[in-house]
């Protein structure tokens, strides 16, 4: 079931309204950061990955399809993939 908050966020994202990012950050950043930190095990990389996650969310906002995934699932996948990419990049540079 889609919540009113999710409907509001999706509506703002589809319109290109930057308030959507603020609302997402307020409501989901802690959970996304937790996911990212579990993958990266490094606070600096995790913070960088979280920031990049929000950039990707904004750039891909109009591609989000609520019939394919709930909003949090979509955000989670972006965060997870960004964390994995950041970790690979870090390991390639310093590993």
Label every PLM stretch briefly.
Residues 1-31:
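N-terminal module of bacterial RNA polymerase sigma factors
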């Amino acid at each position: 079931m889609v919540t009113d908050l999710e409907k509001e966020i999706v509506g703002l994202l589809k319109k290109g309204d930057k308030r959507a990012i603020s609302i997402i950050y307020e409501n989901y950043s802690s959970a996304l950061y937790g996911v990212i930190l579990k993958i990266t095990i490094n606070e600096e990389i995790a913070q960088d990955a979280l920031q990049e996650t929000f950039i990707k969310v904004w750039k891909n906002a109009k591609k989000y399809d609520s019939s394919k995934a709930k909003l949090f699932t979509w955000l989670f996948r972006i965060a997870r993939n960004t964390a994995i990419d950041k970790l690979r990049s870090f390991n390639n540079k310093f590993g």
